[in-house]
Amino acid sequence: KYGIINVHSSLLPKYRGASPIHSAILNGDTETGVSIMYIEEGLDSGDVILREYCEITEDDTLGTLHDKLKELGANGLTKALKLIENGEVQAEKQDDSKATLVKPITKEQAKIDWNNTKEVIYNQIRGLNPFPSAHTSNEKGENIKIYKSEKIEKKYEDEIENGTIVEIINKKGPVVKVANGGLLILEAKFEGKKLQKGVDIINGRKMVIGEKLLYSDSSLK
C-alpha cells in the first residue's frame, strides 16, 4: 500500500551506489546530505520523498561525516514517515541524466600517489579515514597508513622528487613534497605499530629529511 522506503547518504541522483560518503569527500564537495526515497528495481533510482542537507567542512573525515549523516537520516526518516502517515507525500522523480554512480572503494584508490596535488591527497586521506585508510610505503618496504594531514602552501625545489620528506615542522611532523607544495603528516600508523602523532614520528626518527615515500604496492593490512 505505502511502498518501501530507504535512506541513502547522498543528495540523489548524485552518488547512487556503494560509496556516496567517501566520494563526496574524495571529490572535495562542500555539501552533501541524505535522501529519503522509495525503493524500486533500479539502483537508488526511486522517487525522492525528501532531502536533508549537510555541510562538509575542511576537517570532516569519512568517520565524522558518516556520523552526521546517520543523525540526519534518522531525522529525515521520521519526517518522511509523518508525511506518509498524513498522506502529504509529494515525491520527486529523479533526473536520470544527472545521475552519477559510485562503486565500492578499491585497494587501488587507497594508495597515495605523491605526484598528485596536495588537495587531492588531503581529500584522499580524510575520505578514507578510518577505513580503508590511505597508505604509502617507505624505502624499507614498511606499509604506512596516513590518517590526518595538513596542506602546506610552499614551493619546494623542482629537482626534489615528489614523495620526499623535505621539511620537519617542529612539534608537528614531517612534510612530504607533492605536485604543488607539501603535505604535513599529523597522524600515521606504521605496519604492526599503533597510531602515532606526527610529532612522535619525528621524535622517533621514523621519518627523516631526504627519505622517500613510495606509491605503495603492498596489500592493505
Label the model's feature ranges.
Residues K14-A18, W114, K194:
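Alpha-helix N-cap/helix-start motif
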Residues N115-K221:
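An anion-binding loop in the catalytic cleft
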